[in-house]
């Protein structure tokens, strides 16, 4: 059960990265980027698999050398998730990694080289039927744009993006998505609002170099949350100085909080006070860890006393109202039964897993009926 204000999402052109649709009516996808040595195939594959387990729809892999291109080809064979190759400066790497199986190329047409080299890359992308992401960052704008605007701002980032877009459009290539990232929340939001008014291709949202886990998550939630509420954005990446699977989790937490896309358990819990009938923080910390693998969407409310407990529990799929020695369980808004307060973690985990199985079976039956 949930309530939400409608979000009027901006209608964009739909493109495909592998089998994942980006833009149009497709769900907003969540992606991350590996931080291993790409040449360490085993470590990179293991990291990608951890991200996929966390829910990643797409993964980006850096390919700065021809050795990494060779490794990319091996990685491509070992994972099922679509892979985006991150390429800078050397157009030959872009050509080689496309041939090695890249599902998308992340480039800046402005730093790949001459028009002839850009034409080669675009022809290659057309040949392999893969899209290109134009990635503009506030920290690496072209020198003439820096001189013109003196400092990074939304207009400067828009001009850089439109310059790169014009290169692709002149080559009759429209299978692209765009990002205009900055490490500053306000600059990021301004740039995306400006570009969204100019183009109808998909937008990849992110705050670049957002920082360490806590502060980076906050910056990303503010910037991306505000843009998503405005209906802007088709795929997101949370850039953190942390393990990439944590980026995936935060990305889905943002989408869940906006009722845009649910993936796993949405935890609702009180901050706890002297009224609590059990250790709320201990219970919730344990549950968050134990239930990380759940993918079926549901709301779980755990409140430590009867002041706000019943109201929150009625709005959740599973709700707990704390009391001693027994706590009251609500199921789908209705009172259900009592459970031992001393054994809350095990009891709640069991109920959540059972509900997840019910939801999975229901979803499978709906798929069968459609077929």
From Swiss-Prot:
Its needed co-factors are: [4Fe-4S] cluster
GO MF terms here are: 4 iron, 4 sulfur cluster binding; 4-hydroxy-3-methylbut-2-en-1-yl diphosphate synthase activity (ferredoxin); 4-hydroxy-3-methylbut-2-enyl-diphosphate synthase activity (flavodoxin); iron ion binding
Q: Where does [4Fe-4S] cluster bind?
A: 270, 273, 305, 312
The pathway that the record names for this protein is: Isoprenoid biosynthesis; isopentenyl diphosphate biosynthesis via DXP pathway; isopentenyl diphosphate from 1-deoxy-D-xylulose 5-phosphate: step 5/6
The alphabetized list of GO BP terms reads:
isopentenyl diphosphate biosynthetic process, methylerythritol 4-phosphate pathway; terpenoid biosynthetic process
Chain ranges passing through the membrane: none
Catalytic EC class:
oxidoreductase
Describe cofactor binding as the record notes it.
Binds 1 [4Fe-4S] cluster.
Q: Which family does it belong to?
A: Belongs to the IspG family.
Function field = Converts 2C-methyl-D-erythritol 2,4-cyclodiphosphate (ME-2,4cPP) into 1-hydroxy-2-methyl-2-(E)-butenyl 4-diphosphate.
Q: What is this protein called?
A: 4-hydroxy-3-methylbut-2-en-1-yl diphosphate synthase (flavodoxin)
Organism placement in taxonomy = Bacteria, Pseudomonadati, Pseudomonadota, Gammaproteobacteria, Moraxellales
Q: Which gene encodes it?
A: ispG
């Amino acid at each position: 059960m949930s309530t939400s204000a409608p979000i009027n999402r901006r209608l964009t052109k739909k493109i495909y990265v592998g089998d994942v649709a980006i833009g149009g009516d497709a769900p907003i996808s969540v992606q991350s980027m590996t931080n291993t040595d790409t040449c360490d195939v085993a470590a990179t594959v293991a990291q990608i698999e951890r991200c996929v387990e966390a829910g990643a729809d797409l993964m980006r892999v850096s390919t700065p050398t021809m050795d990494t291109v060779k490794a990319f080809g091996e990685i491509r064979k070992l994972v099922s998730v679509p892979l985006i190759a991150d390429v800078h400066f050397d157009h030959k790497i872009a050509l080689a990694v496309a041939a090695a199986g890249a599902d998308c190329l992340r480039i800046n047409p402005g730093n790949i080289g001459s028009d002839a080299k850009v034409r080669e890359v675009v022809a290659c992308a057309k040949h392999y039927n893969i899209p290109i992401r134009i990635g503009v960052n506030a920290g690496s704008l072209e020198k003439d744009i820096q001189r013109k605007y003196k400092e990074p701002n939304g207009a400067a980032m828009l001009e850089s993006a439109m310059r790169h877009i014009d290169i692709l459009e002149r080559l009759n290539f429209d299978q692209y998505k765009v990002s205009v990232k900055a490490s500053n929340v306000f600059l990021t939001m301004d740039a995306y609002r400006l570009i969204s008014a100019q183009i109808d291709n998909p937008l990849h949202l992110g705050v670049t170099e957002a920082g360490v886990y806590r502060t980076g998550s906050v910056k990303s939630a503010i910037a991306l949350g505000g843009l998503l509420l405005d209906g802007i954005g088709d795929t997101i990446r949370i850039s953190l100085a942390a393990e990439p699977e944590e980026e995936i989790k935060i990305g889905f937490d943002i989408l869940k909080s906006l009722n845009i896309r649910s993936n796993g358990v949405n935890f609702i819990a009180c901050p706890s006070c002297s009224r609590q009938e059990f250790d709320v923080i201990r219970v919730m910390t344990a549950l968050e860890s134990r239930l990380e693998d759940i993918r079926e969407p549901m709301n779980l409310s755990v409140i430590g006393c009867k002041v706000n407990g019943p109201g929150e529990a009625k709005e959740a799929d599973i709700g707990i109202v704390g009391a001693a020695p027994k706590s009251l369980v609500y199921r789908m808004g209705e009172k259900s039964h009592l459970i031992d307060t001393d054994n809350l973690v095990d009891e709640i985990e069991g109920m959540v897993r059972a509900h997840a199985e019910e939801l999975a079976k229901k979803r499978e039956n709906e798929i069968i009926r459609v077929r």
